[in-house]
């Protein structure tokens, strides 16, 4: 099987421990995102303090760091690159953009916490960029699964 074929990638994906570990962080991060958005909306309605919102964002960012680290190990095992594998370039670039906005939010909080409109605007932008990243990631994952299934079907291989 050629090294870059869909089935070779599938085999490397199945052989990597990071295929199991990475989704724990990715799903945890997504869950933390939804919780954080809930806190954000509750804050806007006056139901929770800003500190609760900020704490939920910090948890989400910590899980994102875990997802990025485990994702880089996974990418190395599957594609041979720690970061920016040609097959995963869009996802890696989007992740960097998401990180930039998360860090921008933390910067606004650190230096302008008393300017709540600026803090909330930056948080809203960070949430939107993260949501776009999640959508493209889900799309890519589904497309990759379909390509693998098509290759397996064509070669008569059971999953």
Protein language model regions, located:
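Cytosolic juxtamembrane amphipathic/interface segments immediately preceding
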Residues: 6-19
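Short, charged cytosolic
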Residues: 1-5, 66
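Short, highly charged, low-complexity non-transmembrane loops/tails of multi-pass membrane proteins
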Residues: 144-159
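Hydrophobic cores of alpha-helical transmembrane segments in multi-pass integral membrane proteins
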Residues: 21-44, 50-78, 87-111, 115-142
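Preference for short coil/turn "hinge" residues that link or interrupt alpha-helices
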Residues: 11, 80-83
């Amino acid at each position: 099987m050629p090294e870059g074929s869909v089935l070779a990638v599938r085999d490397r994906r199945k052989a990597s421990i990071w295929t199991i570990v990475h989704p724990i962080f990715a799903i945890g991060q997504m869950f933390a995102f939804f919780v954080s958005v809930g806190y954000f909306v509750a804050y806007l309605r006056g139901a929770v303090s800003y500190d609760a919102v900020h704490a939920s964002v910090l948890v989400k960012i910590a899980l994102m760091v875990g997802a990025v680290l485990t994702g880089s190990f996974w990418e190395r095992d599957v594609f041979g690159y720690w970061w920016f594998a040609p097959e995963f370039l869009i996802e890696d670039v989007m992740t960097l953009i998401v990180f930039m906005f998360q860090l921008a939010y933390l910067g606004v909080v650190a230096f302008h916490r008393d300017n709540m409109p600026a803090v909330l605007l930056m948080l809203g932008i960070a949430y939107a960029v993260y949501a776009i990243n999640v959508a493209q990631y889900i799309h890519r994952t589904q497309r990759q699964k379909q390509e693998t299934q098509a290759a397996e079907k064509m070669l008569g291989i059971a999953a």
